[in-house]
C-alpha cells in the first residue's frame, strides 16, 4: 500500500470514527482539514510511508476519539497538527491559523514541547484541552518509539520523561490516558532492561 493509500486510509478511519462517536458534520470538516494539513509535510518529507511518524496525525486524533471520547473538533484538529518530535514536519502556526482558525492555532501554540525546560510546570498549569492534546500527541510518539533505529538515548530520555512528567499529568487529566501511560511505562521499562 503506497503512502497516498495509507494516508487516505487513515483519513477515512479518522472520519469514520469521529462520525460514529457523534462529532457533528462541521467538526468532521474541520478535523479532515486538520488531518490533511498534518499529513502534507509528511507526504513529501518522509521517504518511507511506513516511517513511524507518517501516520502520527491520525493516530493522535484516534487516541482522543477512542480512549477519551473527545468530540471537540478544536481539540481533535489541534492534535492532528501538533508535532513534538520533528521540526521539519511541524506545520507553521501561521498556516494553522489561516486554514483552521485562531482557536485551533492558539491551542497548538499552548502545547509545550517535550524539550521545554518548564515542561512539567507548563503541563500541570495548562487547561484540560492543552493537556489532552499534549498527552495524546506524546503517547503516540512514545508508542512508536521502539521503531526508532538505534536511538537508545532517545528511548531512555523518553521513558524518564513519560514516567516523571506525562504520567502524573495523565493522572490529573483522564483515567484512560492514565492507563495507557502506565502500560507504556511498564512495557518500555522492560524493553530498556533488555537492551
Regions inferred by a protein language model and the residue ranges of each:
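Active-site helical microenvironments for divalent-metal-assisted chemistry
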Residues: 1-195
Amino acid at each position: 500500500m503506497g503512502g497516498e493509500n495509507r494516508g487516505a486510509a487513515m483519513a477515512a478511519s479518522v472520519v469514520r470514527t469521529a462520525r460514529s462517536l457523534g462529532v457533528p458534520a462541521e467538526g468532521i470538516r474541520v478535523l479532515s482539514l486538520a488531518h490533511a494539513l498534518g499529513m502534507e509535510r509528511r507526504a513529501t518529507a518522509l521517504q518511507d510511508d511506513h516511517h513511524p511518524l507518517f501516520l502520527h496525525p491520525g493516530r493522535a486524533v484516534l487516541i482522543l476519539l477512542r480512549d477519551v471520547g473527545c468530540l471537540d473538533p478544536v481539540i481533535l484538529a489541534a492534535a492532528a497538527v501538533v508535532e513534538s518530535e520533528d521540526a521539519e514536519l511541524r506545520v507553521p502556526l501561521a498556516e494553522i491559523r489561516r486554514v483552521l482558525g485562531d482557536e485551533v492555532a492558539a491551542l497548538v501554540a499552548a502545547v509545550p514541547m517535550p524539550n521545554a525546560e518548564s515542561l512539567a510546570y507548563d503541563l500541570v498549569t495548562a487547561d484540560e484541552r492543552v493537556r489532552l492534546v499534549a498527552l495524546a500527541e506524546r503517547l503516540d510518539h512514545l508508542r512508536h518509539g521502539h521503531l526508532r533505529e538505534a536511538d537508545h538515548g532517545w528511548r531512555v530520555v523518553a521513558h524518564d520523561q513519560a514516567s516523571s512528567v506525562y504520567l502524573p499529568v495523565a493522572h490529573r487529566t483522564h483515567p484512560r490516558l492514565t492507563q495507557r501511560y502506565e502500560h507504556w511505562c511498564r512495557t518500555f521499562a522492560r524493553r530498556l532492561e533488555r537492551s
